[in-house]
Curated annotation (Swiss-Prot):
Disulfide bonds: none
Membership in a protein family: Belongs to the DNA polymerase type-B family.
Enzyme class: transferase
Subcellular location: Host nucleus
Name the UniProt record assigns to this protein: DNA polymerase catalytic subunit
GO CC annotation, single: host cell nucleus
Entry's transmembrane regions: none
Length: 1012
């Protein structure tokens, strides 16, 4: 064990780590010994692990020199000053028994135990560096009658073993205001309790809370204290004024390691990055029984790992392949050959330690690749891999939050941790930022890179791999291409810059940005502003403020459904919820919880919000400006400054950084409201969340009332907005037809289009000035003409003569087949781009059942009916392309795990298994078509009809035309339902009734006809 040992109680169950063993289980495919041979060889090996590179043998050890890498010795530094950039930091503990090589001036901070902040980054010269920071105290506040009794209680907790660790602590009186609830007086009998050990601080705080003490800020972790209390950046540049190198007994695996006191650090505002090293990696496995590999199954081994090493900027592209068995050379690739899986995995982790990338990416590596490697080393080989991180006693691990276990393979969000490494998995990034039918790497590469993967079926991988060195090279190229594609995706989306900006803004680590929710990012911001105002945050017990939590959500006005062939103006409230919170001073710090605190104030100083039987009151800014309001104001002002700076910026990289910064500010602003409404959050407050939505409803209703009462005459538009009589084409009619949370749809009849477009922004400004407090602002967004308003949150509209806007309609659903989508799209296009159909649709929507029977449908509607007839012909005459009839569902878990077995995509998988064809993996989207039933039974279930599209094409199986046409009728009816007249007949039946009748004979009748 190193003379400097660090312990993180959140990551380690105990301080005794597993020891590396001299012997190990050796598992390898028989085919790498005898070409083409199936099965595995399993035995125990006593020889030293080794690898082969370019026909030379290398023994594997942590301190080995990696053959393909050139390591340059670090230079000597001036001990009086150093400049460095950090991308990550972790909290660790040091104990008395570990101080032998620690400089004397830092020893008292860790006797008997103490916190050490480890910061990872690059020096100004590009050297990888670890900075050990001493002197950061961890503390909380506690209400108690006197300090002596509190000290005795804490001493007793340490002595009785509830904490199982001791450290120095200090108790001192504190004079602070509570953030929660308006009050003019500081908290009575308040003490600040400071500890040298962050773990002890948190444990003591929780125990005191459970014993009934009122405590504050026990949930604030020591890294947040470090960044907030000192005004430090969690991602950025620092000067260290004075430091001492750690030459002996290092705690890190980096060549440069220094020690300093927290007061020696100075944070700098430079936003530029140094060059950071990155990896993109991918693994290939062999499932022993042909099933999807399970890391805990002994025989489901890793056979290859590809790594592409690159930098955050520049063109460096170094490719590495770790493989079992010998492998033919691949151009431009370093190939490392291993005799067993354990040696391959060990070689990979040694390479991780030696090359030591700061960022690691891949595609679904959190849920699969990294998780698989960790489980293999832990469960199969019982080998501790934390030493391969940036810390010698570090951690490489995974965790799945309890609530995520119930989710499927791709839906579960696994948290991964490696000391000093940031994981940026491109799968969750791209699946959250773009819309696609599925999120397989091949699909995303086609959409975003216009590149297609070279396919190698899962059946071919084992055959190729055991066939010999040339076959393993084929598998290696296939493995490498995934890593290469991910590098291109990584550089295209630049998510790492976005993460860094959020981290800087929120005073949290980049790891927190990636793996934690919004409240973890907002909480430190609130803490920062509260600290500036001498306020402290109460620690909520689990039941406090959560009983019966829930409130009426955002208002959606009942839409006046219909087909509108006249212009509809859409207005949006700019940053609605943040604006409401700022305008009305809504905050924890302004909420009135005790009426005695406002006894000396007049009612004009108080905002009262009534919600049914409940009333919430807040003091106005003249009494106290809210903490949340101040934060929001600052962020929005910064965003305006950043966007202005972007306009004048010519440097592409700086412009990218500025864009990520303004996006981080926008996201953070929009998250504040959610923090107050999170029932199980750090600072829930139903009074704030409910008041925001209540005031939002009032704004929506007041806008509707104003439009319906004040904006109904030509005189209004002439006097207020400068129109003249020539701007009107008939009797003016203005009405609000829909309101959805922060949007208002206003239909305007008989006003010239050019005039309406000119005054639309003026209308928004007029309503804003008349009705709302600053900074609430109604903005003109767009004009839709025509508009099909189907129901709440579902509409289709045409913008700017050519662009169709879809919201919540079947046309864009992932589960609809392309054929159905195409028919719906054609009919929607007729309604929006064919004037004859538009005129007919308006007439059709106002017809009665009697008029329909006597007059028939308007002429323009026949174009819609003809398109439906064409689709019917294609389906019933088997002329539709099977590839356009494919439906799909995601296989979210193993087939056996489904409680409902009668699902279409599961039926397809069973058919494939029966025919011994390739079985999809968990996470894949399963494509299928519905085939004609053999019995002619119309009531056959979909799962009985579902078949693999390739099998249908190969065997020319007829499809179930009636099922598909039924889907078309339903989808078309849903999309254009507002144009149907109001009759007693169901709309789907009416549409079928309007179509000309036609009988389609199947092959049986054709055969009879031939005989006759």
């Amino acid at each position: 064990m190193d003379s400097v040992s660090f312990f993180n109680p959140y990551l380690e169950a105990n301080r005794l780590k597993k020891k590396s063993r001299s012997s190990y289980i050796r598992i390898l495919p028989r085919g790498i010994m005898h070409d083409g041979a199936a099965g595995l060889i399993k035995d125990v090996c006593d020889s030293e692990p080794r690898m082969f590179y370019r026909d030379r043998q290398y023994l594997l050890s942590k301190e080995m020199t990696w053959p393909s890498l050139d390591r340059v010795r670090s230079k000597d530094y001036d001990h009086t000053r150093m400049k460095f950039h950090i991308y990550d930091a972790v909290e660790t503990l040091m104990f008395t028994d570990s101080i032998e090589n620690l400089p004397f001036q830092y020893r008292h901070f860790v006797i008997p135990s103490g916190t050490v902040i480890r910061m990872f980054g690059r020096s100004e010269d590009g050297e990888k560096i670890c900075v050990n920071v001493f002197g950061q105290e961890q503390y909380f506040y506690c209400e108690c009658v006197d300090g002596k009794s509190l000290k005795a209680t804490i001493n007793n907790l340490m002595l009785t073993g509830e904490v199982k660790m001791s450290c120095s602590f200090v108790i001192e009186p504190a004079d602070k205001l509570s953030l929660y609830g308006y009050n003019a007086n500081t908290v009575v009998n308040l003490f600040k309790v400071s500890f040298g050990n962050f773990y002890v601080s948190q444990r003591i705080g929780k125990i005191l809370q459970n014993e009934g003490f009122v405590v504050y800020e026990i949930d604030v972790d020591v890294l947040t204290r470090f960044f907030v209390d000192n005004g430090f950046l969690s991602f950025g540049w620092y000067n260290v004024k004075k430091y001492i190198p750690q030459d002996m007994g290092k705690g890190s695996n980096l060549e440069v390691e220094i020690n300093c006191h927290v007061s020696d650090l100075v944070s700098l505002e430079n936003v530029n990055w140094p060059l950071y090293g990155c990896w993109s990696f991918d693994i290939e496995c062999l499932g022993q029984n042909g099933n999807f590999p399970d890391a805990e199954n002994l025989g489901d081994i890793v056979i290859q790992i590809s790594v592409v090493s690159f930098d955050t900027e520049g063109d460096r592209d170094e490719r590495h392949l770790f493989t079992l068995g010998t492998c033919e050379q691949i151009d431009g690739v370093h190939i490392y050959e291993f005799a067993s899986e354990f040696e391959l995995l060990l070689g990979f982790f040694i390479f991780l330690r030696i090359e030591s990338p700061e960022f690691i990416t891949g595609y679904n590596i959190n849920n699969f690749d990294l998780k698989y490697l960790c489980i293999r080393m832990d469960k199969i080989y019982h080998y501790e891999i934390g030493c391969f991180s940036k810390l010698k006693n570090g951690k490489i691990g995974i965790s799945v939050p309890h609530e995520q276990y119930k989710k499927g393979f791709l839906q579960a969000q696994t948290k991964v941790f490696t000391s000093g490494v940031l994981y940026l998995d491109m799968y969750p990034v791209y699946s959250s930022k773009i819309t696609a039918q599925n999120y397989k790497l091949d699909t995303i590469a086609k959409i975003c890179l216009q590149q297609e993967k070279e396919q190698l079926s899962y059946k071919e991988i084992p055959k190729k791999f055991i066939s010999g060195p040339s076959g393993r090279a084929v598998v290696g190229k296939y493995c490498l291409q995934d890593s290469v594609l991910v590098v291109r995706l990584f550089k295209q989306i630049n998510y790492h810059y976005e993460v860094a900006e959020v981290a800087r803004l929120a005073h949290v680590t980049a790891r927190c940005v990636v793996f934690e929710g919004q409240q973890k990012k907002i909480f430190p911001c609130i803490l920062t502003e509260a600290k500036r105002r001498n306020m402290i945050l109460p620690s909520m017990v689990s039941s406090h403020n959560r009983q019966g939590i829930g409130y009426k959500g955002a208002t959606v006005l009942e839409p006046k459904t219909g087909y509108y062939a006249v212009p509809t103006v859409v207005f949006d409230f700019q940053s609605l919820y943040p604006s409401i919170m700022m305008a009305h001073n809504l905050c924890y710090s302004t909420l009135v919880l005790d009426e005695r605190q406002i006894a000396g104030l007049s009612e004009s100083d108080i905002l009262t919000v009534k919600l049914g039987d409940e009333t919430h009151r807040f003091v106005k800014p003249c009494v106290r400006e809210s903490v949340l309001g101040s934060l929001l104001k600052d962020w929005l002002a910064k965003r305006r400054e950043v966007k202005a700076e972007m306009q004048n910026c010519s440097d592409p990289m700086m412009k990218l950084l500025l864009d990520k910064k303004q996006l981080a500010l926008k996201t953070t602003c929009n998250s504040v409201y959610g923090v107050t409404g999170a029932a199980h959050g750090l600072l829930p407050c139903v009074a704030i969340a409910a008041s925001v939505t209540c005031l939002g409803r009032e704004m929506l209703c007041s806008t509707v009332d104003y439009v319906n009462s004040k904006m109904q005459s030509e005189q209004f538009f002439c006097e207020e907005l400068g129109l003249t009589a020539s701007d009107f084409t008939g009797d003016l009619k203005v009405e609000v037809i829909y309101g959805d949370t922060d949007s208002i749809f206003m239909s305007v009849r008989n006003m010239a289009n050019e005039s309406l477009r000119r005054i639309a922004p003026m209308i928004a400004k007029h309503i804003t000035d008349r009705l709302f407090k600053s900074p609430i602002k109604l903005e003109f967004e767009k004009i839709l003409c025509p508009l099909i308003l189907i129901c709440k949150k579902r509409y289709i509209g045409r913008q700017d003569d050519s662009l169709l806007i879809f919201k919540g309609v079947d046309l864009v659903r992932k589960t609809s087949c392309d054929f159905v989508k195409g028919v719906v799209k054609d009919i929607v296009d007729l309604l929006f781009f064919d004037e004859e159909v538009q005129t007919a649709a308006v007439e059709f929507s106002h017809m009665t059942q009697t008029q329909l029977r006597e007059q028939g449908v308007p002429v323009g509607i026949h174009k819609i009916l003809r398109r439906l007839c064409k689709a019917r012909e294609e389906l019933f005459q088997n002329r539709a392309d099977v590839r356009h009839l494919m439906l799909s569902s995601v296989l979210s878990k193993e087939v056996a795990a489904y409680k409902q077995p009668n699902l279409a995509h599961l039926s397809v998988i069973r058919r494939l298994a029966q025919r011994k064809e390739e079985i999809p993996n968990v996470g894949d989207r399963i494509m299928y078509v519905l085939i004609a039933p053999s019995t002619g039974n119309k009531q056959t279930h979909n799962y009985e009809l579902a078949e693999d599209p390739n099998y249908v094409l190969e065997h020319k199986i007829p499809i179930h035309a009636e099922k598909y046409f039924d889907q078309i009728i339903k989808a078309v009816t849903n999309a254009i339902s507002p144009i149907f007249p109001k009759t007693d007949i169901k709309k789907e039946k009416l549409l079928l009734y309007l179509l000309p009748m036609k009988v389609y004979l199947d092959e049986t009748f054709s055969a009879i006809a031939e005989v006759m």
